[in-house]
């Protein structure tokens, strides 16, 4: 096993264990059983989410997209497929729209069942920015995800569809790690994904606990969510390690889909969710710049 493969396997195991760790913290600590949390709790999650947004922004613009464009242009030139159509950018757009359409399908499905359930899954926001009724994930500013969910609506089908959507996000995130060809890039993207996933799984676990979901279901949801990024890493490793004539082109296309997913996560989830809030805007921008600057420095030094 070469060193790069060892690094990817280490990232796979580390991402799995740390995601499980952050997901199970709320289930074990009484502090998180208090509905609504504290202002300090919300502020810390919000600042960490902004930092993660900066990390993702830097990884997108300075590393993932440039490397993908270089790889895909090289593969297209080998096969004389460069006919003037912006195919590389189109592939990225496909990754972006795949995640967007998936999420909207899930939300439409839950909306279609709204009248059949006692409690709605998507809690409408009040004018002051807070939802009436049961708390939603949106109440935690640092959740890192913009899907506003009321887990007290205990339809097993709707809960499964929601976590399926989040889990597919994670598969594409892990895919970006598995497709990398250098140790530094694997570690850089792994850090970004780890910060992002930890915030999401932590916040979702808090709301599951506060909504009196059975402990067994909390464990199941957290475990399924945790294994999705490692699954994506494994798929990427298989693609890289499989020697076939079209392997380079397949790898480049998957890199483009993963890049589109990163664009979606950064620009439609983390940044709007945090920066649209009027609370502590300058501090949020500061944490955003810190995350971006650290990853930019790593790119420069690497």
From Swiss-Prot:
Subcellular localization, as worded in the UniProt entry: Cell membrane; Endoplasmic reticulum membrane
Reactions catalysed: Zn(2+)(in) = Zn(2+)(out)
Disulphide bond pairs: none
Principal location: membrane
TM spans (from-to): 7-27, 45-65, 87-107, 159-179, 186-206, 220-240, 248-268, 282-302
Topology with respect to the bilayer: Multi-pass membrane protein
Gene Ontology biological process: zinc ion transmembrane transport; zinc ion transport
MF term (GO), any: zinc ion binding
InterPro entries: ZIP
Topological domains, Cytoplasmic: 28-44, 108-158, 207-219, 269-281
Family to which this protein belongs: Belongs to the ZIP transporter (TC 2.A.5) family.
Xref: PANTHER family: ZINC TRANSPORTER ZIP2, ZINC/IRON TRANSPORTER
Cited function: Transporter for the divalent cation Zn(2+). Mediates the influx of Zn(2+) into cells from extracellular space.
Name the record gives this protein: Zinc transporter ZIP1
The encoding gene: slc39a1
């Amino acid at each position: 096993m070469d060193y790069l493969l060892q690094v990817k396997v280490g990232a796979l195991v580390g991402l799995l264990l740390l995601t499980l760790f952050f997901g199970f913290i709320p289930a074990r600590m009484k502090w998180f059983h208090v509905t609504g949390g504290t202002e300090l709790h919300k502020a810390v999650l919000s600042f960490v989410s902004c930092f993660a947004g900066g990390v993702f922004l830097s990884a997108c613009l300075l590393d993932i997209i440039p490397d993908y464009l270089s790889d895909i242009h090289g593969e297209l030139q080998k096969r004389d497929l460069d006919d003037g159509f912006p195919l590389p950018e189109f592939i990225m757009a496909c990754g972006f729209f795949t995640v967007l359409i998936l999420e909207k399908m899930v939300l439409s499905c839950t909306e279609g069942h709204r009248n059949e359930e006692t409690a709605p899954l998507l809690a409408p926001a009040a004018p002051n920015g807070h939802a009436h009724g049961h708390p939603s994930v949106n109440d935690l500013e640092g959740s890192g995800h913009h899907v506003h969910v009321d887990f007290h609506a205990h339809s097993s089908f709707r809960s499964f569809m929601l976590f399926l959507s989040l889990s597919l996000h994670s598969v594409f995130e892990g895919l970006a790690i598995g497709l990398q060809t250098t140790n530094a890039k694997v570690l850089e993207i792994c850090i970004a994904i780890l910060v992002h996933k930890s915030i999401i799984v932590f916040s979702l676990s808090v709301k599951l606990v506060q909504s009196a979901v059975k402990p067994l279901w909390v464990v199941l949801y957290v475990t399924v969510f945790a294994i999705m990024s490692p699954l994506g890493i494994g798929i990427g490793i298989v693609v890289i390690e499989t020697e076939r004539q079209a392997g380079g082109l397949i790898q480049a296309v998957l890199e483009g889909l993963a890049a589109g997913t990163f664009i979606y996560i950064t620009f439609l989830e983390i940044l709007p969710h945090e920066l649209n809030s009027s609370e502590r805007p300058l501090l949020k921008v500061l944490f955003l710049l810190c995350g971006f600057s650290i990853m930019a420095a790593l790119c420069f030094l690497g």
